[in-house]
Each structure stands twice: as structure tokens, then as C-alpha cells.
Regions:
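Start-transfer (signal-anchor) and selected internal transmembrane alpha helices
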Residues: 1-46, 56, 156, 268-278, ...
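Hydrophobic/aromatic-rich transmembrane helices and adjacent perimembrane loops
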Residues: 229, 448-479, 504-525
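Extracytoplasmic
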Residues: 17, 21-51, 58, 71, ...
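Perimembrane helix-loop-helix junctions
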Residues: 199, 217, 230-281, 510-511, ...
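Active-site lumenal/periplasmic loops and adjacent helix-entry segments of GT-C-fold
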Residues: 28, 32-149, 153-161, 165-186
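Membrane-embedded helix bundles of polyisoprenyl
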Residues: 79-84, 129-148, 153-242, 438-441, ...
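Alpha-helical transmembrane segments at the extracellular/periplasmic loop-to-helix junctions
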Residues: 285-288, 305-376, 405-408, 428-431, ...
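Transmembrane alpha-helix segments characteristic
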Residues: 275, 358-445, 459-467, 482-496
Length: 901
């Protein structure tokens, strides 16, 4: 290894180390919660001083990691050799079928932290930082892959675009403990070594690269379910590449073979793919088992069907429609400047902004057009003999040249039509790879925003190549100083705009600095005749690189600076109260979002959580919270949390109709067991044996204790839980009902009038107008719809228009219900205005009329007054815990209950 080779390798290592430091430095501030004031920051920090995790999946991973550290396996029980989690999906729990790479790695890091560094770190402390540390290591494969295609600067740009990609960064900062951390590391290594297997001329190197590729995907398979996406991607690429080899005359001349099949069997590309296939089957069999390998195709089709949010499952609604990451993403965020920003608001924003989109598409066009130009050119025959000594390149130069993908912007007619010098086989190889990669990931993105992370990779790598193109073009073809200045000005604008979104002064300063440096370099410094490339061109190239990465860097900075944990002391303390006071067989029921947190903080089983949500459970929980019949709500909890889905399954087996089965259950759940059984026989024509069998599940003799959690976040989520609860089984559709909650309060003293915006959207400002008299019980209120720009009342055909008109008013002042009446002159409204006042501070909440007497409204907003089925046993700020009193229900043996509105 000569001096130049050592310098080349050393330079790459230094660049990687610098990039690692930069990326981690951008992630680390998230741990300090800088967006929160010190006076409220304490609400989001646990008793150990560590911020709460940022989302609920982290708590599931943390609990499994702690399980493994505690008793050597994940979950709570070993049943027939399988690990079972008894904290989930009451009453039966779940067999754990989860990639445990995150568990094994975190436990290993925990051991290293305490043994090597001599610390006394908890699993939770290590887990808090694991995502940020591991995801930062994606710098290594990103730089290696991109440096294979472009120059140093292009590789730096591509690496930053990948590792700081908005959707990836938003899931990998400190306090986000999920499997996303592995995503780019293994996918990049898998594809890189896959392509290197095809590129290699030596059979030994083909095998080595194939082994490394399969090792990467094998480790990926232990870390994230979505690994099968990349197996499918590269499988499709392999087929398309073989077709491209034939179409573009890659390899041996087709005329030398008697048939297409004979030609194909003798191609180097086929040999590479066969090697990958054989090693891949054997390698994945080691990681996933033979059945796992054969099940990959089914898993691929299942993954795609899973993303179809409108798909109805067994007659019940698909709960995935309520998962944000499963929604069809927007192309761009809102606002004129949005196209130039990097964030999670749209697909283009997710890849780094409009500049990255155009840069990537330009390079893709070059690759494809070059491939077609090459079609009539015979593939170069590779020789193994050494050139004459005087014509040999240094090892370092050969390594650098071999790593670069030699193309020029001349292909775009910028600066001339120079003869194409690139390698035909590589051009077709990478053209095929990136076309397939972008098409498949674009299709995936159409199935949900979670796949935006997949489309980042090809566009980032193509942008890295673009930097190399631009560098060559500026150095060799662009001589007009005026055009150099135009490029500098454009780049200054593109770089300053995202920084201005953080701080206007900084944005303007960056723009002026780039322009000033550009002007001085172009017009103020005379070129040195001894210098092959003048300084001004390096300044222009640097400006291009800065313009491309600044949106992504600024987006990462904003994300890190605005992190707010996914929970607070209120919810955690409420769960701790359950843990300390309730029996071990207690089930916690609520909407699924906080299920993972309930499991770890309360150490109790839950009805469902973020990984066990089903359409059936979503319907029943939504029905329980939407109905005005608290007997039905209690009956649903009694059934689900003690016998699970057995009653539904039994009736579906009898009737063959899930909708009819649900209708029957809604009818019998509020009744006594004897009346329920009689109803099944007399009204629904079941025989006595069938009726007794069903009632055994709907009315279990010893129902498990149930705590219902009502929290403020569920107000904003009402649109979803009412959607599921109001599901129409006949036409397979639904409607949703909402609460509209303001972001602040308004002060209204006696004798005064105040107003507060409840909703400001689409040019419409919905305001609650509150009028207070000077006597007792003289507070009145109504809702107005105003033009956001002018403040005037909205009109339609010269008549006042208010789509959120309130027809009913509920007033609670200082904890007492003062009014529950109709609003005069607004009888045609579809909403109820709930007004809560305390010490002259008023909070108006607008709700659909269908929610006025709903179980959730009665418990959370009205405090459970006027009923005895649910008892408020504990409260924290924004969190109320209700014990279900089954003995006070008709089904529980009471003659009657105070349950209906």
C-alpha cells in the first residue's frame, strides 16, 4: 500500500468521522427539550431526571428490553416454547412475533456501558440514547455507497441528505427508541453489496460481496419487519436488469448464441444473481428458518395489502386508516416557500426539498438517455493484462477513478456535446437500479407516508452524483463570470430560505455572505495562471453543495430543537397509581394510542395497544365511548376484557354475518344474562344451547376489574374513535363526530363579553362569544363564523352562514352545572357549545350534537355526574381514571342503574 493509497483511505476515514460528529451533534440537543420553558419542563421529565420517550412504541421496546435483562426472554410467559406477552390484548395476551434486534443490541450496549465505562446506567438510560447513536452510524454505509458513485463533496452531500432526512431524523433522536434506527444502515449495505456482486469481475469477489449483502439483509430481518420490502425491490431490479442487459446489448454479442436462453445462461449478470440467490436462500434460512424464506413472498403481498387503508377486515373497519403513517402523504407542505424546505409535511419535503427532486431527476435522465445512446455501442471487452509501466496509474488514483461514476453534464447539452466516455455496463446497471428504485418506492409512498424514508435513498444518491456532474461542468465548461454569479445568487437564495425559517436575520446573513464571497472570488481575485482551476469555481461548487444540504440540515435542527415527549407526569403518575392500588388482574381500557405506556407504567394488561389494534376492538371501544347508554359501555368492557372476541366469533359462526352479530350484541350486552339468553332465542332464533354458549361470553360470572382512562388527548382523537364506533356494517362506511378545542382560555368578568377562536381554517374563523351578566346564572354563549381576513360574519347567498352553528349550550361554572339548554334562534345547528368557567377564565369546547350525551362527554367533561356505573377513582391534570362498577349494572345483577342521559 503506497502513500497515495494511504492518504485516500485516511481522507475517507476523516470525512466519515467528521460527519458522524456533525450528525450526532444535531441529534443530541433533543435530550434537553429546548423548546420547553424551565417552569414546565419538569412535567415532561421522569423521577430519574430523564425526559419521557417521544412516542409510545418506545415503551413497548423498552419493556421487552427490560424483560430480556430481567429473565432472559421477552414477554411474561413461555408457552410451548414460545414467548407470550400477557400485558397486551386482554384477556389472552399475545404470542410475541417481533424482530428482537433492538432488544439484543440495547442489552449489549447496557453491558458495555456498565462494564467498559464503569457506569451504573439503567436499561432505560441506555435505551434513551440508543436510537440516536445507532442511527448516526448510517453515515458509514451512506458515505461508502455514495463515494462509489461520486466525488468527496458529492458523497458528503448524499450522506447528509440520507442521515438527516426529515422522516428518518424525526424517528431517531434521543428519546425515540424504535427500530427505525436500523433502517438505513442495513438497507444501504444490502443494496451496495448486492450491486458490487454484479460489478465484480472475479468470482471470488462476487461470492464475498454476495455473502456481505445477505449478511446485511439477514441482520435487517432481525431488526425490522420491513426488510422484505428490500428483498422485493432487489428481486424486481434483478429481473429488470437482465432484461436491460439483453435490450442494451450488455455482455457477449447475442448473435454468437443460437437462442436467447443460451445467451442468458452465459451472462455474467445472471451468474451474479444466481450466486446472490443461492447464498441468499441459505443465509436467510439461517436467520428466519426455511419456512420464513418460503413465506417471504406472502409477506410481501401482505405488506402491500396492509397499506391499503380502505381495506375492510372481516366486515369491521380497518383500524390502520387512523394511523398517521398509513395515510397518503401530500406532495408538498402548505405555503409558497414550502417547496424549498425539508420537513415531514410532504413527499418532496421529505427528500430534502424541490432542489433535491430536480437534481435527482436530472441525473436519472442522464443515466437513461446515456443508456439508450449506448445501445448500439458494443460492450467493452475487459482485459486482465497489465498496461505498459509508463501508462499505469497509481493505486490511489485507480481507487478514486474506479469509485467515481464518470459522467458529465454535457449529456444535458450544457457546454457542448463531448463524446461519452462512461462505461456502458455501469451506465445501464445504475440506470436500471435507480429507475426501479424510484418507481418501486414511489409506489410504496402512495401506500403511506411511512415509506417516504424509502424514496429518500435513491434521490440522495442521485443528488450526490449531481454534485459531481456540476463540479465537472463548472470546472471544465463554465467560463462566463456572469453565469458563475447567477449560480452563486441562486444558491444563496436556496440556502438562505430554510435558515430564514429558523431565524430571519441568520437567513439574510447567510445570503449576504454567500453573495459577498462569490463576488469577491469571481471579480476580486485574479486567476493564477499556475492554478488549473481558479478559486472562483471552487466557491461556486461549494455554494451548490451548501444550497442542496441546507434545507435538510435546517430541518434536522428544527426537529431536534422542538421535541416534546409523548407523555408527561400526569399520565405517568396516573398509571403509577393504578400499579400501586389496583389488583394484578385489573385491565386498563382506553383508546389504543397510550396502550404501550399503560403496560409499562401500570404493569397491567390493556384492552389493546399500538401493535394489537384491530378493527373489531376499535369498533367496540369507539361504540363504548360514543353511545349514551352507559350500561352498554360497561357491557362492552365486561365482554372484551374478560372473554375477548369469543362472543363475536360465536355469533359470526352462527349467523355468518358480522354486522348482524354486532347488532345482536349491542342489543343484549346491557341486559341481564337471563334476559339476554331469552332475547337470543325469541328474537334472533338461536337455540337454547347456542344462546347459553354466547351469553357465557357476553355475561361472564366473574368479570375482571376494569379501569377506563379518559384523557384530554382523546378530545382531538374523537373524529377517529367515533368513526369506528359509528361504523355502518351494511354499507361499510361511517361518519365521524368531533370536539373542537381552543388552544387558550379567555377572561370574561361579570358584565362583560368576550370571544375566543375555536377553529381557524380555510379562511373561516369559528368563534365562541361569551356574555356574562352581573347576577347568578346569567352566562350565555353562542357560536359565530367569521371571515378570517376581514372579521365579518360569513354569508352565503346574502344569509349568515355558519357550518358549525351550536344549537345547545352547556355551562359549568366553578364546578357546578349551571345550564343545559337550547340556544334560541339556533335550533337548526348541529353542534353543542360546552362552556367551562372557573374564576372568570372560560374554555369553550364545541362538539357534535351526537357527542352531547356520549359516555366520554359525561365522564371527561361532566366529571361522571348523574350516573353510578363509572366511579372516578383518581385524577391528574388532563387524566381521569374511572372504575367500572359492574355490580351497579343490570347485567351485573342490579335492578336498574342511573346510566342513561
Amino acid at each position: 500500500m503506497n502513500k497515495n493509497t494511504i492518504l485516500t483511505i485516511s481522507k475517507s476515514i476523516i470525512i466519515i468521522l467528521i460527519l458522524l460528529a456533525v450528525v450526532f451533534a444535531l441529534k443530541a440537543p433533543a435530550a434537553d427539550l429546548p423548546v420547553l420553558n424551565n417552569d414546565i419542563k419538569g412535567e415532561y421529565v421522569d423521577s430519574s431526571g430523564l425526559p419521557y420517550f417521544s412516542e409510545m412504541d418506545s415503551y413497548y421496546n423498552l419493556r421487552l428490553t427490560q424483560d430480556y435483562a430481567d429473565h432472559g426472554y421477552v414477554g411474561d410467559k413461555m408457552i410451548n416454547g414460545s414467548e407470550w406477552d400477557m400485558h397486551r390484548y386482554a384477556p389472552d395476551g399475545n404470542k410475541i412475533n417481533y424482530e428482537l434486534g433492538i432488544v439484543y443490541l440495547t442489552n449489549w450496549l447496557h453491558d458495555v456501558a456498565n462494564s467498559v465505562f464503569g457506569g451504573n446506567y439503567s436499561i432505560k438510560e441506555v435505551a434513551f440514547w440508543t436510537g440516536a447513536i445507532i442511527s448516526t452510524l448510517a453515515v458509514i454505509p451512506a458515505y461508502i455507497f455514495s463515494r462509489r458513485l461520486t466525488n468527496d463533496l458529492g458523497a458528503i452531500v448524499a450522506t447528509l441528505l440520507i442521515v438527516l432526512a426529515p422522516n428518518y431524523f424525526a424517528h431517531t433522536f434521543p428519546g425515540f427508541f424504535d427500530t427505525d434506527m436500523f433502517y438505513y444502515i442495513f438497507s444501504l449495505f444490502f443494496i451496495f453489496f448486492f450491486v458490487e456482486t454484479i460489478r465484480a469481475d472475479n468470482i471470488i469477489w462476487k461470492v464475498v460481496f454476495a455473502v456481505l449483502s445477505i449478511l446485511s439483509i439477514g441482520l435487517f430481518s432481525q431488526s425490522w419487519t420491513g426488510y422484505i420490502f428490500y428483498i422485493g425491490l432487489m428481486g424486481i431490479f434483478s429481473i429488470v436488469y437482465l432484461i436491460a442487459c439483453y435490450f442494451f446489448n450488455i455482455g457477449d454479442d447475442k448473435s454468437d448464441y443460437p437462442s436467447k436462453l443460451s445467451w442468458l445462461l452465459h451472462q455474467d449478470a445472471l451468474l451474479s444473481i444466481v450466486i446472490l440467490g443461492i447464498i441468499g436462500f441459505a443465509g436467510l434460512a439461517v436467520f428466519k428458518g426455511i419456512d420464513g424464506v418460503f413465506g417471504i413472498f406472502g409477506s410481501l403481498t401482505g405488506l402491500l395489502s396492509l397499506q391499503s387503508a380502505s381495506r375492510v377486515v372481516g366486515g369491521f373497519p380497518n383500524v390502520l386508516v387512523s394511523v398517521a403513517e398509513m395515510q397518503m402523504p401530500s406532495l408538498l407542505g402548505s405555503g409558497i416557500t414550502s417547496a424549498f424546505l425539508a420537513n415531514t409535511n410532504g413527499v418532496v419535503n421529505g427528500i430534502g426539498g424541490i432542489s433535491i427532486l430536480f437534481a435527482g431527476l436530472i441525473v436519472l435522465y442522464v443515466l437513461v438517455s446515456r443508456s439508450f445512446k449506448f445501445r448500439s455501442v458494443k460492450d467493452v471487452v475487459r482485459t486482465t493484462g497489465k498496461p505498459q509501466k509508463g501508462n499505469r496509474l497509481s493505486a490511489a488514483k485507480k481507487i478514486d477513478n474506479d469509485r467515481r461514476f464518470k459522467l458529465s453534464l454535457a449529456d444535458l447539452k450544457f457546454g457542448g456535446n463531448n463524446e461519452i466516455l462512461a462505461d456502458k455496463r455501469l451506465t445501464v446497471l445504475y440506470a436500471t437500479l435507480f429507475v426501479v428504485w424510484i418507481v418501486i418506492t414511489a409506489l410504496a409512498v402512495s401506500r403511506g407516508s411511512r415509506f417516504i424514508t424509502t424514496i429518500v435513498l435513491p434521490f440522495a444518491l442521485l443528488t450526490g452524483i449531481f454534485v459531481s456532474f456540476a463540479s465537472d461542468y463548472v470546472k471544465n465548461r463554465l467560463e462566463d463570470d456572469r453565469w458563475l454569479l447567477v449560480i452563486v445568487c441562486l444558491c444563496g437564495f436556496l440556502a438562505a430560505l430554510p435558515l430564514a425559517a429558523i431565524n430571519n436575520i441568520f437567513g439574510i446573513a447567510l445570503f449576504l455572505v454567500i453573495i459577498a464571497v462569490g463576488v469577491v472570488a469571481i471579480y476580486g481575485i485574479k486567476p493564477n495562471a499556475a492554478t488549473k482551476v481558479p478559486l472562483k469555481k471552487y466557491v461556486v461548487i461549494a455554494a451548490i453543495a451548501i444550497a442542496l444540504v441546507t434545507p435538510t440540515v435546517c430541518g434536522a435542527y428544527l426537529t431536534s430543537e422542538t421535541v416534546v415527549p409523548g407523555t408527561s407526569d400526569s399520565m405517568w403518575n396516573a398509571m403509577q397509581w393504578i400499579n400501586e392500588t389496583q389488583s394484578n388482574d385489573t385491565v386498563i381500557t382506553s383508546w389504543w394510542d397510550f396502550g404501550y405506556l399503560f403496560e409499562i407504567a401500570a404493569d397491567k394488561q390493556v384492552t389493546f395497544d399500538g401493535g394489537s389494534q384491530t378493527g373489531s376492538r376499535a369498533f367496540w371501544l369507539g361504540q363504548a365511548m360514543t353511545t349514551d347508554n352507559l350500561e352498554l359501555s360497561a357491557g362492552i368492557f365486561r365482554m372484551l376484557d374478560t372473554t375477548g372476541e369469543r362472543a363475536t366469533e360465536a355469533l359470526v359462526n352462527i349467523t355468518g354475518d358480522s354486522g348482524k352479530s354486532v347488532h345482536i350484541l349491542i342489543d343484549i350486552l346491557p341486559k341481564s344474562s337471563s334476559d339476554a339468553q331469552k332475547t337470543l332465542v325469541d328474537k334472533y332464533n338461536l337455540n337454547s344451547q347456542q344462546a347459553a354458549y354466547v351469553v357465557n361470553f357476553t355475561h361472564p360470572e366473574n368479570p375482571r376489574p376494569v379501569i377506563f382512562v379518559a384523557s384530554s388527548d382523546m378530545l382531538q382523537k374523537a373524529g377517529w374513535w367515533t368513526y369506528f364506533g359509528a361504523w355502518n356494517f351494511e354499507n361499510q362506511s361511517s361518519v365521524n363526530y368531533n370536539y373542537y378545542v381552543p388552544t387558550s382560555q379567555v377572561t370574561v368578568k361579570p358584565g362583560q363579553t368576550g370571544n375566543l377562536s375555536i377553529l381557524d381554517s380555510g379562511g373561516m374563523d369559528i368563534r365562541a362569544v361569551i356574555e356574562r351578566g352581573t347576577g347568578n346564572n346569567t352566562t350565555a354563549a353562542h357560536v359565530e363564523a367569521l371571515n378570517s381576513a376581514t372579521g365579518e360574519k360569513l354569508k352565503l347567498n346574502d344569509s349568515e352562514y355558519n357550518p358549525l352553528k351550536a344549537s345547545n349550550l352547556i355551562v359549568i361554572e366553578d364546578g357546578y352545572l349551571m345550564k343545559n339548554e337550547s340556544i334560541k334562534g339556533a335550533e337548526d345547528g348541529n353542534f353543542t357549545l360546552f362552556l367551562m368557567g372557573n374564576s372568570n377564565q372560560y374554555t369553550p369546547i364545541l362538539m357534535s350534537n351526537e357527542l352531547e350525551n356520549s359516555m366520554f362527554t359525561r365522564l371527561f367533561l361532566l366529571g361522571g355526574a348523574g350516573q353510578d356505573v363509572f366511579t372516578n377513582v383518581h385524577s391528574e391534570n388532563g387524566v381521569m381514571l374511572y372504575q367500572v362498577n359492574f355490580n351497579n349494572t343490570v347485567a351485573g345483577g342490579a335492578s336498574s342503574s342511573n346510566s342513561t342521559a
